[in-house]
Regions:
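Juxtamembrane segments of multi-pass membrane glycosylation machinery
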Residues: 7-9, 111-154, 353-358
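Membrane-interface helix-loop-helix junctions at transmembrane boundaries of multi-pass membrane enzymes
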Residues: 37-39, 172, 222-226, 379-406
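Hydrophobic, aromatic-rich transmembrane alpha-helices
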Residues: 28-33, 345, 349-355, 366-394
Length: 461
């Protein structure tokens, strides 16, 4: 198998990897084409399937090439090298491998590795969240012949299934705009790039997609045991890698749950009168569950989250981030301190870096995307200002959009409050960016169709 000594960054992609990659890509695309052929007879939405898989795989290859030849390594390579040491340990001594992946990281367990297996990077080994990524990658490396390129592509392919499930779910609710929704969920350039490598973000975005899909299936009453299982696994991945994502998801989930029940009530007085009750119950249950998960959430627990955000924000704007820092101002880790910075943080999370803040090609691409999102949001904002009632009616009559909107707002504030570095920001936005763009598209289409109907009615008069 292809071997590289640990603690030496990969300088190039070996020809062996390209040969194995060709085989895997042909195999994956062959299976995708066969699956699309079977499914498209039942549902025309599968016309996007092969194209989505191909673009996802191509994005992974581009990610690897850019990180090896442009960035000369990075966290993605460190994840790979740490996972490779686990894979070697799995092959050499499966008992010690089970010990390492099931027990806490200790110095004693660290020395279960040796020169024949290579050693995991210490800063990843002793961080449970980063080491979890390496644990997930170890079996993938085994079937990828321990190739960085091939294992990245396989992970990217696996993550695509969650994106596809969410795409089909949203299209089922909002038919007729599948092409536009495919741009948001399957073909958004920054989401494809940052969600196609060996990074936390690839796994967490896929977990978010599976979470929303399973929650919707649970509410719809379709195979609830399977939905609960998927929901549990997705939540476990989020808690294990980035717990604050679950914190952003949970309040909207509770609102969606209660709102879906109330929306079935036919009497408008009862239905709209219950709205304050919905939000109160969502807050109480959400706060209670997140508090109960305190130990699992660690530094992102309810009582420590604000302090964590403040400390992280101050760190990410230090000089050693080489000029890519920005500053929304320091804030106290209190409710009042967060409330004062929430609007600025939300703008950061949703729309920055602005195009004039780009310092390299990758940042420029993100800036161009953000400019489009900003213009779309401004067009929608104008409609909201001139008729706020219609906007809130749209949200309350569409629990899925209400959920995605609340998740986008909460997550953008969390990211904006805890990030002061554009390099980190473009990656941290991934778990909510595509969902936020979906919200913009659905709301924009709602107003566009409303205007078209109004013009048609005026013409008929």
């Amino acid at each position: 198998m292809f071997e590289i000594t640990n603690y030496s960054y990969i300088r190039y992609i070996h020809s062996f990897e390209w040969a194995i990659l060709t085989f895997y890509i042909l195999l994956i695309l062959g299976m995708a084409f066969f699956y699309q052929t079977l499914q498209i007879r039942k549902d025309p939405i599968y016309r996007f399937y092969v194209k989505g898989v191909f673009i996802k795989l191509a994005s992974s290859v581009a990610f690897c090439v850019i990180y090896i030849y442009y960035y000369n390594g990075g966290d993605t390579v460190s994840y790979y090298e740490t996972a490779r040491s686990l894979t070697n340990l799995m092959v050499h001594d499966f008992g010690n491998y089970l010990t390492v992946i099931t027990q806490k990281a200790t110095l004693e367990n660290y020395f279960l590795f040796d020169q024949s297996t290579g050693y995991p990077w210490p800063y990843m080994y002793y961080d449970s969240q980063t080491f979890f990524v390496a644990k997930v990658m170890a079996p993938i490396l085994l079937i990828a012949f321990k190739s960085y390129l091939v294992s990245s592509v396989i992970l990217s392919w696996i993550s695509f299934f969650g994106m596809w499930k969410l795409f089909t779910t949203i299209c089922r609710y909002y038919p007729g705009i599948e092409t536009k929704l495919s741009f948001a969920l399957l073909f958004l350039p920054s989401a494809l790039f940052w969600g196609s490598g060996i990074l936390k973000d690839t796994m967490t975005f896929s977990a978010v997609c599976w979470y929303i899909y399973a929650f919707e299936r649970l509410l719809a009453g379709n195979n609830r045991i399977r939905a609960l299982l998927i929901l549990a696994v997705a939540s476990y991945f989020l808690i294990s890698i980035k717990p604050y994502i679950l914190i952003a998801l949970f309040p909207g989930s509770m609102i969606w749950f209660f709102h879906a029940r109330i929306s079935r009530v036919q009497v408008k007085l009862i239905k709209y009168g219950a709205i304050p009750f919905i939000y109160a119950m969502a807050f109480v249950i959400g706060f209670g569950v997140l508090s109960a998960l305190g130990n699992s959430l660690g530094k992102f627990s309810v009582d420590r989250m604000l302090e964590t955000a403040s400390v992280t924000q101050k760190d990410l704007k230090q000089d050693y981030y080489q000029g890519s820092s920005f500053d929304i101002g320091d804030f106290e880790p209190t409710i009042a301190g967060v409330a004062g910075k929430a609007p600025a943080a939300m703008v950061v999370g949703m729309f920055r870096p602005f195009i004039w803040e780009a310092r390299n090609v990758v940042m420029l691409a993100s800036g161009l995307e953000n400019l489009i999102f900003l213009l779309l949001a401004l067009a929608i904002s104008y409609r909201i200002i001139t008729g706020p009632g219609r906007f809130f009616k749209l949200l309350f009559e569409n629990p899925l959009i209400l959920f995605m909107f609340s998740y986008s707002v909460i997550f953008s504030i969390l990211v904006g409050m805890s990030t002061s570095n554009f390099g980190a920001l473009v990656r941290f936005k991934l778990p909510f960016l595509s969902i936020f763009v979906c919200v913009l598209i659905v709301i924009y289409e709602f107003y566009r169709k409303e205007s078209a109907l109004a013009k048609m009615a005026q013409t008929l008069r």
